[in-house]
Structures are given as C-alpha cells and as structure tokens.
C-alpha cells in the first residue's frame, strides 16, 4: 500500500514539475524569436493615456505563450516527432518535403497555381515595372528586373507527392506581359533549372552561395555585356549555414549545411552592420561602373558578387521602391530583384516616383464616380492620390490617366483594392477637380474622383 501511495506521489510530483518548471525558469530565460516571428512584450497595467488596460489578460496570455521556459526545446521535440512519425510538421509556415527538405508553405499557391494572376493583374504588374523603367531611362539610368525563383519551382521533385505542380505560374504570366511591354528582364528560372549542381539550401528558402554566383553571372552578362568570373574568389574552405526554415521548426537544433566560402576585395562603408541592413553601400577600386539594387532576402547571398563587379554599389531593402532615392545616387543601372512568392507586391505597393505627364486624351464621360484619397507624400512638391476603379469597366490592358485641370498624368495601376491606382502628383493640382480616364471596350472614358 505504501509503495502504491509513493508511486502516486512520484507521478503527481513529476507532472507538477513538468507544469511548473517552464514557468519557474521564465525570469532567467531570454527568449529569442523563431524565424520572423514577433515576440509579445510584457503587458502594461495602464495605457499611455493613463486608463486601465482592459486587454491585459489577453496580452499576458500572448506573452506567456511566447516566453515560457524551454519553449524552443519543446517546439523542436514536437516537430522532430511529427516529422519522423507522421512525415509532416506542426508548423503554419514550413512544409516537410522528401529527404528532409524544407519549403515555405507560402509558396504553395505559386507551386499549385491556386492564385493565378488575372489578365488585368498580369498587365498591371508588368506596367508598374514599365513605368519604373521609363522614369529611370528619362533620368539617364538603365533598368532591369529579375525574379528569384521559389525553391520548389526548381526542386519540385523534393515536394510531397500530394501537391501537383501547376503548368502555368504567375512568374510566367508576368514574363509574357513584360515581353509585350518591353520591360528589360533577366530570366533566372532557365539558368538555375538547367544546372545540375544543388543551388538552394535543403533547409533554407534561399539559394546558396553557388546559386547566388550563377544568378549574378547571368545578371552581369546582361548588365555589363561580359562574362563574370568568380571561381578565383573561392578560397577552398566551407562555411556553416543554419537555414531559416530549419530555425523555425527546430529552434533548439544545431544542424548546419556547408556552403562555399569566398574571398572578395570590395569594401563596405563605415555604416555597415550586417547583410540585413536596410541600405548597404560598397566600393571596389578594381571594378568600374555603378549599380543600385532593390533587393529582398535573396540579396544576402547575391550582393557580394555584384559588389565585387562594380566600382560603387548601393543595395536597398526599402519597399515600396523609392525611385527618387535612385536618382539621388545616379547609378548606371537600377536592378530590381524580387522573389517569386512576393510578385503580388508589384500590385499592392506602388513605387514612389512622380507620375509621368501624358498627352490629353479625348474621353467620354461615364457619368459615374470612384472613390479616391489625397494624402501627403514623402517626395517634395508632390501629394499622393490613391483610389479604386473596381466599379468601372476597365479593359485588361488599359493604363489609368489622371485628368487634372492643368495637365494629364499616368497613375501606377497598383495599390489597395480590386482595380487600384496610385499617382504622385504636383502639389499645384491638389485642390483641382480630378478625373480618372481609362480604356473601356477600346474607347477612352472617364469618371469623376470623389474624396
């Protein structure tokens, strides 16, 4: 009887310890974010205005969920068990593929073709790039756009068999429109897919250094007209790399992948901290020319090769793209690199540049109106006009003009809404009556814009 009672006590003690220990160690544990997550802060009893924080219990619940003891170890153990036993992961962000390859779940829509661009969206995304190209060329700057392929666009053979790859994807639809609208584009899909060497990390969403090297060589052949040689920069060593996807599902793990190491001769400016900096400036006295690159996280591995190839280079993660920042630098060329899974950003985040002036068009009045907003802009001497023509019959391949009393301007066909537009207009037209003109069944028509 005593032995049985002792067994109960030990069992209860073990369970109690398991429950209490994660709470008990919280004051001494510094929790780090997993992947790109934002950890909840400790809640305040009162708000900034001095009133009682009625949401304190919910906020504390979020804080506890993000900071309890041994959180990383528990997440890692859980995903190791589910991955081994069920061949899946208990993760909203990461997908387990074959041979322990990891993929972003956010790329599934691209991979399966579940959210294909409409004809209008394909035209609009390419047209935004065309307007950026026009602005650059008018300011004596070359322009080029490229797409960093999703990992499963190149390594679909490592995806779970339950997902079927689409025959057409948004990148292809956009590429067709860019060709029709004469947007300068470098196709990295063909270059990378034709290469037998593994060019992406198994447990990361990005290309490895060899993949970045091949991408850079393809870009530089177009941008500088000559083959770039980087094999001489390889130092014969390897560097360990911990994948971003691996850290999300196995935050307490310590496995790495070996990556090719290079020795470059370019130099960062004194403001440089890391490859994640919003803006990076480099110099290389042994190279010529200058480049401005709008990039995303794929630029972490890509930028060293471009920095090595140009006398002066600027790399920026700012989004929306600020074209006025480019003209301030006055580079030889602007390169825009965007990962495949974020191509929708071209439809949602309008580039910051003055709306180009256009010749007035004879347009018939539809007798209708559309909602628009006039907001302050960051560019000196301009304001930002945004709106949505979703109630109008706009042709798929129609530009959008803004008719002011003193001029006609073209808006970027992107922003918020189903049929959005954004235009940075001169301040002197802010108080004028504005209209939106567009093609409808091949004919120019206009509607009033109501604030």
Residue ranges and their predicted role:
Residues 1-451:
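Extracellular glycan-modifying ectodomains
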């Amino acid at each position: 009887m005593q032995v049985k009672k002792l067994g109960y006590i030990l069992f209860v003690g073990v369970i109690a310890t398991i429950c209490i220990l994660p709470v008990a160690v919280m004051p001494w544990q510094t929790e780090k974010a997993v992947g790109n997550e934002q950890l909840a802060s400790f809640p305040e009893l009162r708000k900034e205005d001095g009133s009682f924080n009625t949401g304190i219990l919910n906020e504390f619940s979020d804080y506890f969920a993000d900071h309890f003891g041994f959180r990383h170890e528990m997440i890692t153990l859980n995903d190791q068990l589910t991955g081994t036993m069920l061949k899946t992961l208990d993760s909203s962000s990461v997908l387990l593929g074959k041979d322990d390859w990891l993929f972003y779940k956010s790329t599934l829509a691209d991979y399966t073709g579940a959210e294909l661009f409409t004809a209008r969206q394909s035209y609009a995304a390419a047209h935004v790039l065309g307007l950026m190209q026009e602005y650059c060329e008018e300011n004596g700057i070359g322009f080029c756009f490229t797409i960093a392929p999703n990992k499963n666009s190149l390594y679909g053979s490592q995806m779970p068999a339950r997902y079927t790859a689409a025959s057409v994807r948004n990148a292809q639809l956009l590429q067709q429109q860019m060709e029709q609208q004469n947007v300068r584009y470098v196709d990295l899909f063909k270059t990378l897919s034709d290469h037998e060497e593994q060019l992406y990390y198994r447990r990361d969403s990005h290309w490895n250094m060899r993949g970045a090297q091949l991408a850079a060589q393809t870009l530089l052949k177009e941008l500088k007209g000559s083959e770039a040689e980087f094999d001489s920069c390889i130092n014969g060593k390897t560097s360990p790399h911990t994948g971003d996807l691996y850290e999300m599902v196995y935050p307490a793990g310590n496995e790495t992948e070996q990556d090719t190491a290079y020795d470059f001769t370019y130099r960062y400016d004194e403001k440089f901290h890391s490859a994640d900096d919003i803006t990076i400036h480099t110099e290389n006295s042994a190279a010529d020319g200058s480049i401005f690159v709008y990039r995303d996280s794929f630029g972490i591995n890509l930028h060293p090769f471009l920095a090595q190839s140009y006398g002066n280079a600027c790399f920026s993660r700012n989004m929306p793209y600020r074209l006025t920042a480019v003209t301030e630098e006055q580079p030889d060329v602007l390169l825009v690199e965007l990962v495949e899974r974020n191509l929708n950003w071209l439809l949602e985040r309008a580039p910051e540049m003055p709306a180009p002036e256009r010749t007035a068009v004879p347009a018939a009045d539809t007798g209708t109106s559309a909602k628009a907003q006039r907001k302050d802009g960051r560019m000196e001497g301009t304001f930002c006009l945004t709106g949505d023509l979703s109630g109008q019959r706009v042709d798929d391949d129609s530009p959008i003009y803004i008719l002011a009393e003193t001029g006609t301007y073209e808006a970027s066909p992107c922003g918020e809404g189903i049929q959005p537009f954004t235009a940075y207009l001169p301040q002197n037209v802010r108080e004028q009556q504005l209209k939106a003109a567009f093609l409808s069944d091949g004919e120019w028509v206009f509607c009033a814009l109501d604030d």
